[in-house]
Amino acid sequence: MFLYFSGMIDIKLLEYIESFLTPRRAGLNKKILDERTNHFTVAVEDVYQLHNTSAVIRSCDVFGVQNVHVIEEVNVKRIDREIAMGAQKWVDINRYGSTKECICALKEKGYQIVATTPHDDSIVLKDVDVSKPAAFFFGREQKGLSDLVLENADSKLHIPMVGFTESLNISVSAAIILQHVTSKLRETSVAWQLSDEEKLEKRLEWAKKVIKSHEQIIARYYENDEDK
């Protein structure tokens, strides 16, 4: 008989698979998942330079953002694994063939659309309301975000600058914004962490990614269970 969490996760299977991890690795997975959030997410729209998208994914991993949304309406490319430094294994990458599809999907999930842009009507970073779930959109290197994103944005955001340079690389902008909003979020009473079920699902998924022979281990687990 299997023991499930909310009808989804076989707890005994999870514990069995994790027994093949080192205690340090199993503990690290749990520790990192305690810092993960879906309260904020990031969307990159048709970024031309592949390393920029990869660097944004890496920043999401560093600052605990679990989901990234990649729009490839014009520029269809694979994720640069070298630049992401393995982050693509631990961050969920959601791909879209159009900007409209991405915006609709995020709005349906209750996210505020925040467009990063130097427009005059944009707010500064310190004024972001971190209590609301938000999807931060980053655009193409030269053109920035499309009119569709700007028209559908609930708010617009810019990073204050005082030098001759008027813009930052999108991966740098993403890192600055994510560091600020996630740090500010953790100081609040907002329930920003993953649910218990989401953590269990990720523990199982991450364990499989670490253990090369996980398919054989799972098959053996069910064979042993049937013999009982």
PLM region descriptions:
Residues 1-228:
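Post-transcriptional modification and biogenesis factors for structured RNAs
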